[in-house]
């Protein structure tokens, strides 16, 4: 009935459907429909991304603030329970441990029951996807709810697990961007553009960082450094615009909720502006960078080794395969027991939240000098005005608690990374770096109590500046990024230590990048995700290794003059996704590519003719409409390994055919590239 059309009685106009003819107010309905069509064309104008990026930033800011609000309520409820439960050590211990155990067990079980890809940080998988690998359902919108709920429960455990939300928020932002992109393409009816989709995903990663730290500049640079090996400068504006929208709304919500008087940085500092550091201190900042680089190598090696052990050990692997919540509960119980404040947690400042950890470590006064003549009390309740008291113990001193904190959190964080739940690992690493810098700064303050004399003027040493440099250097070394220096400035709102912090970050990266893969690359290796390693150094001979030395020679070509019987045999006996199409069996000149699925469909739709004296060949199938793809890019047999690797990374390629004088002679994929690079960096032993 709805397909029938007619004319209104006494009306000579365009035909209308019966449903419209009988519907109420047809003129108003047509006007509204026309207005919506006009609005759709304006909002979703082809090539216009402003609305998309602004929507992405605003949505992620709302999600981030709502999560922080909900997490804050749960954390305050836990603190209230711990305070009001009484003086019984058993009840206090149970309230401190059972609460996070229940939250983590629910987080692990809930997220894993919906989709296993919602666990962990999410950045390693995103790096793999942006490199051109397709991971099924990883950006599905159902993962969004699982990750939000699981991450909220993880962060609600407070300082017992000591985890952050940067990585998961990058994943959440990318999922929202992918969903909005699908809505956009469906609404305007344009075909999906893979290149543009990747550009939007990198911009979404910047939004994820910006809505956590309210740091748009470092968010953009960090996402570029972590997510992609090559980035087009013309796409900068997308990341900056979306990240600025997200960071602005995120901080504006805090002002509207009376949490802040105006839009300011997250972590307040009071560093001297006139003379923040003396010139000789540059040497100590560079030395701090070297220390952070060495410690980051140790951390990366231990973390990757322990994660591999957990995945391969007979007992832990079986527990993770069958009862992930049980493994999560056991690991959380151990970590929560260690951080119990009346016990070992007394020496770990475990009553401080992660924000309070950074607020105290960035203090510009020297705790060691302040405790030389007097011992501050350890209060029954946390004193927000004297957070540094949590770091002091009369027997351990400031140096003992800082060193103990570093040693314990070093392995506790490694253990926490094995728990299968949504969690971020950047913020704990940032705090560990701040503790390393604070320890060195306190040692220098004791060694030079009056400061270092330069030009007859003495200025006391500020340990908080070293904590800032250590946080940027250690986190930058672990993630192989330089933008952590800018992140430190945006977090604190001060740039007085710009040069020493940047020098420390560069020194740490120089050591870490030459010795270990980054935290995210190491996770990719352990999870056995598709991964194309970098070629490090100039003297390993990558310019002398040619494609013909490592390419796959056994390729199956289809010539235009191949009989259909042979084509059917090739299709049924191989499982490749595409075949190189050559001009003839004799010449082997590469002229195109035929997709296997389309070729099978064409063969099924057009059965071979049984006319006598006529033998059908592949050319007949192609002439009837079987689509072929032009060969836009190939490798020459004389192409070097270095050039091939750069080409694969630049264009996010998975495989390329190799030609010699136009003839198809082989193909190169990630498998051959990885094997060639591995043989180059670690030559096999001579037989």
Curated annotation (Swiss-Prot):
Consequence recorded when altering residue 278 to N: Ca(2+)-insensitive
Record-linked SUPFAM superfamilies: CBS-domain pair, Clc chloride channel
Main location: membrane
Regulation: Activated by extracellular Ca(2+) and inhibited by extracellular acidic pH.
Complexes and interactors: Homodimer. Interacts with BSND.
Protein family per UniProt: Belongs to the chloride channel (TC 2.A.49) family. CLCNKA subfamily.
Name of the protein in question: Chloride channel protein ClC-Ka
Organism whose genome encodes this protein: Homo sapiens (Human)
Lineage per the UniProt record: Eukaryota, Metazoa, Chordata, Craniata, Vertebrata
Gene field: CLCNKA
């Amino acid at each position: 009935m709805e397909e029938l059309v007619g004319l209104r009685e006494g009306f000579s106009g365009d035909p209308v459907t019966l449903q419209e003819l009988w519907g109420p107010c047809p003129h108003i309905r047509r006007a509204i429909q026309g207005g919506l069509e006009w609005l759709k064309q304006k909002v979703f104008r082809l090539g216009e991304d402003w609305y998309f990026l602004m929507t992405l930033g605003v949505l992620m800011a709302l999600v981030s603030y709502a999560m922080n609000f909900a997490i804050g309520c749960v954390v305050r409820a836990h603190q209230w329970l711990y305070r009001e439960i009484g003086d019984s050590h058993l009840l206090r211990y149970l309230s401190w441990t059972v609460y996070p155990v229940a939250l983590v067990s629910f987080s692990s079980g809930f997220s894993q029951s919906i989709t296993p890809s919602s666990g962990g940080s999410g950045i390693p998988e995103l790096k793999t996807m942006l490199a051109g690998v397709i991971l099924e359902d990883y950006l599905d919108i159902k993962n969004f709810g699982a990750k939000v709920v699981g991450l909220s429960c993880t962060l609600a455990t407070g300082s017992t697990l000591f985890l952050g939300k940067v990585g998961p928020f990058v994943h959440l932002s990318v999922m929202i961007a992918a969903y909005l992109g699908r809505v956009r393409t469906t609404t305007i009816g344009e075909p999906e553009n893979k290149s543009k989709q990747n550009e939007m995903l990198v911009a979404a990663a910047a939004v994820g960082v910006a809505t956590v730290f309210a740091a748009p500049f470092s968010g953009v640079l960090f996402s570029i450094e972590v997510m992609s090996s090559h980035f087009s400068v013309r796409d900068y504006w997308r990341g900056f615009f979306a990240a600025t929208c997200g960071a602005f709304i995120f901080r504006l919500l805090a002002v509207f909720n009376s949490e802040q008087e105006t839009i300011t940085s997250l972590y307040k500092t009071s560093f001297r502006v006139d003379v923040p550091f003396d010139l000789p201190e540059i040497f100590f900042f560079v030395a701090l960078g070297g220390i952070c680089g060495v410690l980051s190598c140790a951390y990366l090696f231990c973390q990757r080794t322990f994660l591999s052990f957990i995945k391969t050990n007979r007992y832990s692997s079986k527990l993770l395969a069958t009862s992930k919540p049980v493994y999560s509960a056991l690991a959380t119980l151990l970590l929560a027991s260690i951080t119990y404040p009346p016990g070992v947690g007394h020496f770990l400042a475990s009553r401080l939240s992660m924000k309070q950890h950074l607020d105290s470590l960035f203090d510009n006064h020297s705790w060691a000098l302040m405790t030389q003549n007097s011992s501050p009390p350890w209060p029954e309740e946390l004193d927000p005005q004297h957070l540094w008291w949590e770091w002091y113990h009369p027997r351990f001193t400031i140096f003992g608690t800082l060193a103990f904190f570093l040693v314990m959190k070093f392995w506790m964080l490694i253990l926490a990374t094995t728990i299968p739940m949504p969690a971020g690992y950047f913020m704990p690493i940032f705090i560990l770096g701040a503790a390393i810098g604070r320890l060195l700064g306190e040692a220098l303050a004791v060694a030079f109590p009056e400061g270092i004399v330069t030009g007859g003027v003495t200025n006391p040493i500020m340990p908080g500046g070293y904590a800032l440099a250590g946080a940027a250097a250690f986190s930058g070394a672990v993630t192989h990024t330089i933008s952590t220096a800018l992140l430190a400035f945006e977090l604190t709102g001060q740039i007085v230590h710009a040069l020493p912090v940047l020098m420390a970050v560069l020194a740490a990266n120089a050591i870490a990048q030459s010795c270990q893969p980054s935290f995210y690359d190491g996770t990719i290796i352990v999870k056995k995700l598709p991964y194309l390693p970098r070629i490090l150094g100039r003297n390993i001979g990558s310019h002398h290794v040619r494609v013909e030395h490592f390419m796959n020679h056994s390729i199956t070509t289809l010539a235009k003059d191949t009989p259909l019987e042979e084509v059917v045999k090739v299709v049924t006996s191989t499982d490749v996704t595409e075949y190189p199409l050559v001009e003839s069996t004799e010449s082997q000149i590469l002229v195109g590519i035929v997709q296997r699925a389309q070729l099978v469909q064409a063969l099924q739709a057009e059965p071979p003719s049984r006319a006598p004296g006529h033998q059908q060949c592949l050319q007949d199938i192609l002439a009837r409409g079987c689509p072929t793809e032009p060969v836009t890019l190939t490798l020459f047999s004389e192409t070097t390994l270095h050039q091939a690797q750069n080409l694969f990374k630049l264009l996010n390629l998975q495989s390329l055919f190799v030609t010699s004088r136009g003839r198809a002679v082989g193909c190169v994929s990630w498998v051959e590239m990885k094997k060639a690079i591995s043989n180059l960096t670690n030559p096999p032993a001579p037989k």
